[in-house]
Amino acid sequence: MALPIIIDCDPGHDDAIALVLALASPELEVKAITSSAGNQTPEKTLRNVLRMLTLLKRLDIPVAGGAVKPLMRELIIADNVHGESGLDGPALPEPSFAPQSGTAVELMAKTLRESAQPVTIVSTGPQTNVALLLNSHPELHTKIARIVIMGGAMALGNWTPAAEFNIYVDPEAAEIVFQSGIPVVMAGLDVTHKAQIHAADIERFRAIGNPISTIVAELLDFFMEYHKDEKWGFVGAPLHDPCTIAWLLKPEIFTTVERWVGVETQGKYTQGMTVVDYYFLTGNKPNATVMVDVDRQGFVDLLAERLQYYA
């Protein structure tokens, strides 16, 4: 039986590729997609979900827009990474269908309520919508199998010296998720910075030769430009968000540890930092499965294999 999932995302190039991967995978049943504000404004990320589903001919999947700003802060966006539209690069279709009239939280709650089995929530943007769901519907916690997030880092941040972007945008929401008691799987920068796509990989995807693999290659062409900055020391571009879907499909290509994670919401220098108790110093019981390594070639091979689905 396919694993039921809800995807909450803020497309974003890597979010878009995560959607491509999920919808090419019969092991997963994508029951709903909700948009969060993060990589771009809430209007643009919602539009980008609709554009991607139009491209992928999946107008059957319910879509709803989420919170327009973080729980307690003003919105920060990453237009320097993802461009004016949030998906700059390829020519994507205009949306051919409309989102549902309700909110992301309402769609998530309805999906959980109606599912015969617990649902995995995959969140590849800030955690605002997921936190709102958890706070407003405690009766549905048992319907959530796990929450798989792209966010955080044990070591270095990518938006501040201490903080990864998704967590930094809404640290209060992330703290709610980590302390919810629901199993959390964290794909942080420690693993996503190892899931780099190289120039040769992009050409491999392009050579697959179907319309979707071509779009993915063009998304990556644009995404590579930001990551060429020497400060990062990257060979290619880290494909953050697809690590969440890849872990669901092939957990064996990832190395994980069970640890307690908290989110710093107050620090002068460390707001948005995910504090990972790697050496069990706090005495707190682990609340997260933390990805620490990935077989990069296995990750690339999985993407290439699933892009064949769109032939």
UniProtKB/Swiss-Prot annotation:
NCBIfam families of this UniProt entry? PRK10443.1
Q: Which family does it belong to?
A: Belongs to the IUNH family. RihA subfamily.
Annotated catalytic residues: H240
The Enzyme Commission number assigned here is: 3.2.-.-
Top-level division of the source organism's lineage? Bacteria
Annotated Gene Ontology cellular component terms = cytosol
Show the SUPFAM superfamilies listed in the entry.
Answer: Nucleoside hydrolase
The protein depicted here goes by the name: Pyrimidine-specific ribonucleoside hydrolase RihA
Sum up the protein's function in the record's words: Hydrolyzes cytidine or uridine to ribose and cytosine or uracil, respectively.
The record's listing under Pfam families reads:
IU_nuc_hydro
GO BP: nucleobase-containing small molecule interconversion; purine nucleoside catabolic process; pyrimidine nucleobase metabolic process
What EC class does the entry list? hydrolase
| CDD domains to which the protein is assigned, alphabetical | nuc_hydro_IU_UC_XIUA
